[in-house]
Regions:
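Conserved beta-propeller blade signature
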Residues: 91-93, 132-134, 171-173, 181, ...
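C-terminal motif of bacterial Sec signal peptides marking the signal peptidase cleavage site
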Residues: 24-27
Length: 402
């Protein structure tokens, strides 16, 4: 079990019903927060989110030598986990929990249009150049065109989890019953459905999937990475990111809960209580692994793969070999998560809405800025030189480092 002491796991048993959901015994309510923002299961940290328990440490002191520049910000209304901006070359789409969908100009943050879904939303946004897709906890999938006009709506088998993926004429929808649905982008009709049996206990997964070269790459409960043909739903290959270990179901959780990253001819993913693994994009051959556990996802530049681990330490690994380039542990007490490229720097976030800039070459802390004081709904996405994310308070930020 990677990086999580047994004592911490025993403490986590008391909050498992809050943080996790069981596929048996009637199921437990899931934690209404951004799951990828949390460190390894810790009762103290979880209760602090609701005003009790121990608070995270004071802000670290370091010389500010870079400017975390907020290029623009848009208030769209309170947003739940599972809602995250969709970045396309000419537009950013975002939605709030009450059902309002926005198209935002990525150059300046101007709202191009807004439209109403007519119901509360739990998942989205997925988009390409012509289609914008959102989902509800009732299993409704709603599609709009790039001008905000309703195109179609269909119902799938269970609640929609995380942003749909729109690519190659297919809308991919992930549902709470473990299914992956391939819908035709033209009318929403089901083209294929993939299903696998989930372990008894899993982390609620809001990540969705990544598409490239006609394939969908998606992580699963139990630590697998799937390569699925978008046209047919057939599995091309299955890679092992992590292997469940331990005596209890809680200890055996080894889920891929963040977006895989496709870079050149490899695809990489990270698992909670597991490791980072990179595979050949076409053949699925394992290229390298590194024992780093994370819920909050990875990003890649021309040299390194970046990840914030479950304890809040930030790592840079050689993207070809997995060798460690540097490790920054100065934000562990702040529960840093969600590493993403922002201009010349690496950006990470903490649960109190602070963002930090790190020098990508050596991991040195160089900048900091405050946002609205609420956690992110998901890992930041990249839009040109900006990192773009949405907070639970309802602000969409575009930030770069200078």
């Amino acid at each position: 079990m990677s990086g999580i002491p047994n004592t911490r796991m025993r403490r986590a048993l008391g909050c498992a019903a809050v943080m996790l959901f069981a596929a048996v015994a009637g199921g437990c309510a899931s934690l209404q927060s951004w799951i990828p923002s949390i460190p390894p299961p810790s009762f103290d940290w979880l209760t602090s989110m609701f005003g009790g328990g121990k608070k995270i440490a004071p802000l670290p002191d370091f010389p500010i030598t870079a400017n975390a520049e907020i290029a623009w910000q848009v208030n769209i209304g309170k947003s739940a986990p599972g809602l995250a901006p969709a970045v396309t070359p000419n537009a950013i789409y975002a939605a709030n929990s009450s059902g309002t969908i926005y198209r935002i100009d990525p150059a300046n943050g101007a709202v191009v249009w807004r439209t109403e879904a007519g119901r509360k939303l739990a998942a989205g946004v997925g988009a390409d150049a012509t289609l914008v897709v959102v989902g509800t906890d009732k299993g409704d999938v709603l599609a709009f065109d790039a001008d905000g006009k309703a195109r179609w709506q269909v119902k799938v088998t269970s609640e929609v989890l995380g942003p749909p993926r729109v690519a190659e004429g297919i809308v991919v929808v992930f549902t709470g019953d473990g299914r992956i649905h391939g819908l035709t982008a033209a009318d929403g009709q089901t083209k294929w459905v993939y299903q696998r049996t989930n372990p008894p206990l899993t982390i609620r997964n809001y990540a969705g999937g990544t598409s490239s070269r006609g394939g969908l790459f998606a992580g699963t409960a139990g630590g697998k990475l799937l390569a699925i043909d978008l046209a047919t739903g057939n599995v091309g290959w299955e890679g092992n990111v992590a292997t469940p270990k331990g005596a209890t179901e809680l200890e055996r959780i080894a889920d891929v809960t963040s977006l895989p990253i496709v870079e050149e001819r490899q695809v990489c993913a990270v698992a909670f209580q597991g490791r980072i693994a990179c595979f050949d994009l076409v053949r699925g051959e394992l290229l390298w692994t590194r024992d780093v556990s994370s819920l909050s996802g990875i990003s890649i530049d021309n040299r390194f793969l970046f990840v914030a681990d479950d304890a809040g330490a930030v790592h840079a690994l050689d993207k070809v070999t997995g060798a460690s380039a540097w490790k920054q542990d100065g934000l562990m007490a702040r529960k840093a998560a969600g590493a993403q490229i922002a201009g010349d720097y690496l950006l990470v976030l903490d649960p109190q809405g602070y963002l930090y800039l790190l020098d990508r070459s050596d991991g040195k802390l160089v900048g900091r800025a405050a946002t609205d004081g609420t956690p992110s709904t998901a890992q930041a996405a990249q839009s040109g030189a900006n990192a773009v994310w949405q907070t639970q308070g309802g602000i969409v930020y575009a930030v770069t480092g200078r």
